[in-house]
């Protein structure tokens, strides 16, 4: 979204079966939390995790953090019951795993009419159908599942994420075309701060709203990288001031630091300031 009322710089996965982790998450500096009932939960823990998470969301105080529940797929024995369990709950979003077509979104939309839906984009077919998926009227966000996508592609890890570039780009284009939030995939080496920072910067520069994270130790870097810097805020203010001054003199462009500033640059500048304001408001809550 161009002007989000809520930041999604850091989106932390928490296993729905881990009571201590659910409790600890109330005090973490995450913009949003994905409470995971899918990959992070063993088969024999699925029902327990669902019940525990439902009760936890009713009683725990997660503040203004967006509460996202990743349910099991509708082709599993748990998926439909997962969705039913969080209808009318305090979940802000239902995250649908392994979305390959808009039909997968509709299958969940039919079960839960009043909760926003996000799609995990993690299959090869999902990449090819990204525009169709993003166009679904109930969808408000996408999450890149880069581990599963790499598995399907049989690709190897590279710091430049060469094999994933096409998929990342297709989903980003689809999300922006339809006004969706879109969050980058995880960085697995949670002790590698330099690698995490580089991948966050790559995702930020591509245009992602934030990054999914697997460990609380990754929060600080993600929050920093996906926040406008003081220099970016200062430049945005100067661009807006210069452009408004130019308009008062009947001119359609301004010059700031030797560079032309047109209306499109002002749109970006206002987006930068809006994001900074949203982050400040979130931090003050």
Curated annotation (Swiss-Prot):
InterPro entries: Aldolase/citrate-lyase_domain (IPR005000), Citrate_lyase_beta/mcl1/mcl2 (IPR011206), Pyrv/PenolPyrv_kinase-like_dom (IPR015813), Pyrv_kinase-like_dom_sf (IPR040442). Gene3D superfamilies: Phosphoenolpyruvate-binding domains (3.20.20.60). It is an enzyme of class 3 (hydrolase). SUPFAM superfamilies: Phosphoenolpyruvate/pyruvate domain. One of its GO terms (biological process) is oxaloacetate metabolic process. Its cofactor is Mg(2+). Belongs to the HpcH/HpaI aldolase family. This is (3S)-malyl-CoA thioesterase. The lineage of its organism: Bacteria, Pseudomonadati, Pseudomonadota, Alphaproteobacteria, Rhodobacterales. The gene is mcl2.
């Amino acid at each position: 979204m161009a002007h989000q009322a809520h930041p999604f710089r850091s989106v932390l996965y928490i296993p729905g079966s881990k009571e201590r982790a659910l409790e600890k998450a109330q005090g973490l500096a995450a913009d949003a939390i994905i409470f995971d009932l899918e990959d992070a939960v063993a088969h024999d823990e699925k029902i327990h995790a669902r019940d525990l998470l439902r009760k936890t969301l009713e009683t725990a105080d997660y503040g203004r953090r967006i509460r996202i529940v990743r349910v099991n797929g509708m082709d599993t024995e748990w998926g439909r019951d997962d969705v039913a369990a969080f209808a009318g709950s305090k979940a802000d979003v239902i995250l649908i795993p392994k979305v390959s077509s808009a039909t997968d979104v509709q299958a969940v939309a039919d079960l839960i009419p009043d909760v926003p839906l996000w799609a995990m984009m993690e299959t090869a077919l999902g990449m090819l159908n990204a525009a169709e998926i993003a166009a679904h009227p109930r969808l408000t966000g996408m999450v890149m599942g880069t581990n599963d996508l790499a598995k399907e592609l049989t690709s190897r890890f590279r710091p430049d994420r060469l094999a994933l570039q096409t998929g990342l780009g297709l989903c980003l284009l689809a999300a922006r075309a339809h006004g969706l939030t879109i969050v980058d995939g995880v960085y697995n080496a949670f002790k590698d701060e330099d690698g995490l920072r580089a991948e966050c910067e790559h995702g930020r520069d591509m245009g992602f709203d934030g990054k999914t994270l697997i460990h609380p130790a990754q929060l600080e870097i993600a929050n920093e990288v996906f926040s406008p810097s003081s220099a970016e805020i200062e430049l945005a203010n100067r661009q807006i001031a210069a452009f408004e001054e130019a308009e008062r003199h009947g001119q359609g462009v301004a010059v700031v630091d030797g560079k032309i500033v047109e209306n499109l640059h002002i749109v970006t500048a206002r987006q930068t300031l809006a994001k900074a304001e949203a982050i400040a408001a979130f931090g003050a809550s």
